[in-house]
Amino acid sequence: DVERSRGLGDVYKRQALKTLLQETERARRFGFTESEYARARANYLQSLESAYNEREKTKHGSYVREYVQNFLNGEPIPGIEAKYAMMNQLAPNIPLQAMNMVMQQLVPDSNQVVIIAGPAKEGLKYPTKEEVISLLKGMKDLDLQAYVDKVSDEPLMKEAPKGGKIISEKEGDIYGSTKLVLSNGVTVYVKKTDFKADEIRMKGTSLGGKSIFPDKDALNFAVMDNVIAVGGLGNFSQVDLTKVLAGKKVSVNAGLGATTENVFGTCSPKDFETMMQLTYLTFTAPRKDAEAFESFKNRMKAQLESAQANPLSSINDSLQKAMYNNHPRVVMMKPEMVDQIDYDRILEMYNDRFKDASDFTFYFVGNIDLETAKPLIAEYLGALPAINRKETFKDTKMSIRKGVYKNEYAKEQQTPTATIVFLYSGKAPYTLKNDILLSFATQVLDMVYTEEVREKEGGTYGVNCYGDLQKYPKEQLLLQIVFQTDPAKKDKLAGIVVDELKKLAAEGPSDVHLQKVKEYMLKKYADNQKENGYWMNNLNDYFYYGMDMTEGYTDIVNSITAKDIQKFVSDLLKQGNEIEVTMTVPNK
C-alpha cells in the first residue's frame, strides 16, 4: 500500500501525472544507482553528525517528537550518541541491492493509491478515475531504461581565486567581535560563540537594493531572487549543485531587499571553505539556465492560478493597493504576467548589484575559529570584484496612504468568512525605546483581544497584531490588526477591536497585562543571549541603523509604565491614518 503525493504544477496536463508514475516505475524496476545512494547516505549521515555535535543543545521539541513516535509507533529511543555510533557502522554496510529490494516492496503491482488535489476552478480539467487506472495498468508494459545518474567529478572551483589581503584587524570591537578590513574594501566582523557546535552564520550586505532600479523594472526585481536561484552557479546547474554538495552542511543564497543587496549563508565549521567558495561564485558566476527558467515559469503560473482560486489571496492584494495607492513598484503577480519576466534583464540587474564588493560588510557569527577562517576570508572575500562605488539607497516615494480609507468587497467562499484588516500608520522616531513600546503594545492588544473577542464573544479563533518600526527610507510606524469571523458578526467584532484600541490609547494597559509582557520580554531577552541569529541581527542593526539595540534594554523594559504605552498608542492614532480592508461574502 503506497500513497504518492506530489505537487504536479499544471495538473490538468496528463503528461505530469504520467511522468510521475513512469519515474516511480523506473525506480521500482531498476532501483537506484550507486551514486544516488551514496549521496542520500552522505546527507543522512551528515544530518546525524550535526545532531550529534549539537547533543548538548538539543531543544525540548526534539525529545517530544521522539516520545510521541515511541508511544504511537513503538519507535525506539536510543539517544543520539547510540544512534550516531550505530548508523555510522550500519549505513556504509547496507548494500544498494537491499535498498532496491525495499523499493520493490514499497511499490507493488497492486494496492496503489493515487491522490490528485488542486483548486476547483472553471476550465481546469483533471484526469478521470478511468484515465488514472489506465495509466497505472500501463506502467508494467512501458519500455523503460535504467536511470543514468550524470555525476561530474569536477570540483566546485577548479582553482582558487587570486585572493586579497587583510590590511587591518581590530579585536574587541562591537559585541566582542573582531573587525577585519580587506584589501578590496570589504569589511568583516567575526563574533565567535559557543551556542551551537555545528553552526556558523554569515550575512553580507550593501546599500542600494531595489531602490536603485526604475519603476519599470518592478516585475523583474520582484522575482529576481527566485529567478537567479534556478540557474545554479559557475559550471553547475541547480540540480548538479545539490550533487556536488552532498554530505555537506552548507548553503548560500543572495537576495535583493528594498534598500540593500544581501548574501546569506550557513554552514558547519568543517564546511566553511565551501561556504566561502559558494559566496565567491554567488558574486562572480551566477549561471543562466534557460530550460530551468522555463520550468520555473510553469511552476509559478500553476502556483498563481492556485492562489487565484483561494479568496484569501485577494486580501493581501487589496491591502497593498490600499497602502501604496496603486504605486507602480507594488507588483500583484498574476499568471498572465509571468511571460513578461525578462531573464536577461534580471541577470543584468543582479550583476550590477554584485559587481562591486568594496562597500559590502560581512558578519560571521557562530562556532568559527578566527585563525582558521582568516586566510579563507582573505582568499575568497578578498578576491571579490571591487570598483569602489560610493552608493546609498534612493527614496522611491512609496509612501503609505494618509487619512482614512475603507474598502469592503465580497467574494464567493466555500466557507463564508469575513476577513478584516486594520492598518494604522504614522511618524515615530526610530529608537530602542519606541521599538520596545511597539512590542509592548502589540502583546497587550493580543491579550485584550483574546479576552474580549475570542473568549467573551466567541467570534474568532484569534485577533493577530503586528507592528513595524521603520527608519528607512523615512521614519514611520505601522500597526496592523487582522482577524476572521462569521460575516454576520463582522461589524460587531470590528467595533470591539477598534474600541479596545482606542481604550488602550486613552487609559493604557492593565497592571496584569503590563507585568505579563514585562516578564515575557525579559525572559526572551535572556534566552536570546544564547542565539546566533540574535547577535547577527544586532550586528546588522548596529551598522545599518547606527544604533545599539541591546544597550540598556532591560532597564528600558523595566521602566516602561502604562502611561508610556498609552501615550505611544495615542500618538499613533492622533495622526489619523487608518486603512480598513474587509473581504466578506455576497449577500444572498
What name fits each language-model region?
Residues 1, 203-266, 328-332, 448-462:
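M16/MPP (pitrilysin/insulinase) zinc-metallopeptidase core fold and M16-derived inactive scaffolds
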Residues 1, 47-93, 108, 307-357, ...:
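Scaffold signal of the M16-like zinc-metallopeptidase fold and its non-catalytic homologs
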Residues 2-8, 12:
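Single conserved hydrophobic/aromatic residue that forms the stacking wall/gate
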Residues 13-14, 26-33, 196, 208-214, ...:
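Short beta-strands and strand-coil junctions in structured, solvent-facing domains, enriched
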Residues 19-22, 32-64, 246-352, 514-532:
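Acidic/histidine-enriched segments that form metal/cofactor-coordinating
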Residues 20, 44, 99, 185, ...:
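Buried hydrophobic packing residues in well-ordered domains
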Residues 32, 39, 94, 109-112, ...:
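Extracytoplasmic
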Residues 38-42, 69-215, 361-363, 368-412, ...:
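Proteolytic maturation boundary segments
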